[in-house]
Amino acid sequence: MIEDLGTRRKNFKLTVSNLAISRVGTSAFSLMILWITLQLTHIPAIAGLADGMFTLPLFFSFFVGSFVDRSRNKKMVAIIASVLRSVSIFLLFIAVSTHVLAVIVFFIFLCVVIMGFTSDISNSVRAIWEKVFLKEEEYQKGSAWMMGIGSLAEMVGFIASGIFIYIGFLRGISALFVVLAASIIPIIFIIQKPDQRERQSVKSDMKEGLKFLKETKILQQMIFLMIIANLAVAMMGIAFTVLVEEIFKLNSVYFSIVFVLVSLGIVLGSIPGSKVKGKLGVIIIPLLIVTGAMFASIAFLHSIYLTYIPVVVIGFCVGMINPPAESVLIKRIPEEMMARTIGIVNTMGVSVTFFSGTIGGLIIQFTSIFYLFLIIGALVILSGLGIFFMKELRDSPVK
């Protein structure tokens, strides 16, 4: 455990620095994968599946969380995961250097899965460090701070993705490797003693985690809400890729601007999100409804510049939602259960996004981009209205 307040604050800043550099790399990677895959294959469903492959490892996130909780040296775990993530980028060299569709798809998918798996490990470690390095009364502000910095980093990553694609796939991939490798540096300077607590068996860890889920109704409701919301929002990547590249016939710069503006909105939204008080339902229900309405409105816009307006609003709403929701969740989770609980949330609530990109691609292929944006909007609105029936989540106080 960390006892010295100065050390704890320094460690938190280093954790945020690691998050920021990682987000630059992973956000650039996520857009590059969509663009590269669609350009090499010209099949939206495959591009959507490539996007979804990043979340495939989240089906096993509970086991990852259990492993991270059990590991004595979490710093070393984070370093190894970051090294593997950086090296995996070179698999893309093979994909872009061949003209055989099966080889292209295989190496792109393999790279994305490794990126997703190692990022899940890193996220689990950071979730524990956020709990350890902050006091309880700092959770909401700390969460907002991490979200704000993370979103600014995503903006940089989205801008970088456009540049990396513009300078050529091989040069861009090399530049992306440098960014991801740099994320290791802050971890090296984090000071944390190895955890000396007694360890249970993996089977006991699983039973304890599932028991905690069964007894914590707000966690069940949060997961259900995430399944619906994430299923919709995760289609956003393939939706905007096709909108910019195939419908508007614009280059990657316009594509990256979409996600830069989402991140800008999140940064702006996280400011009031860090200060808002009251019942969680009262805070997030109207925000989810507005978010859904903004997604649906994009279906009726025929200019990329007009599209940018609802995009900023979507980001702002997300930025306001996350700090109060995350602070409520963190307060309910014991430190020793943090990685496993995040693993449960990822496995049940986030892994569903594995299917989202493919579903979005199929909707586009068999109907049109118009209907995809309407479906995304409807699902987000339904997730907001569903909170009315989730008493524990709806009435949770945000102090």
Regions found by a protein language model. Name each.
Residues 31, 166-174, 211-270:
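A single, central transmembrane helix in multi-pass transporters
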Residues 42-51, 144, 252-259, 343:
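Small-residue hotspots at the loop-to-helix junctions and early N-terminal turns
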Residues 1-12, 192-223:
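Juxtamembrane intracellular "pre-TM" segments in multi-pass secondary transporters
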Residues 14-30, 53-66, 76-86, 107-165, ...:
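Substrate-agnostic recognition of the 12-TM MFS/MFS-like secondary transporter fold
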Residues 49-68, 260-269:
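Central cavity-lining transmembrane alpha-helices of secondary-active solute carriers
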Residues 177-201, 389-399:
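Helix-loop junctions on the cytosolic side of multi-pass membrane transporters
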Residues 34-40, 93-98, 155-175, 246-247, ...:
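Transmembrane alpha-helix termini and helix-breaking/packing motifs in multi-pass membrane transporters
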Residues 77-86, 91, 245-399:
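C-terminal transmembrane bundle of multi-pass solute transporters/carriers
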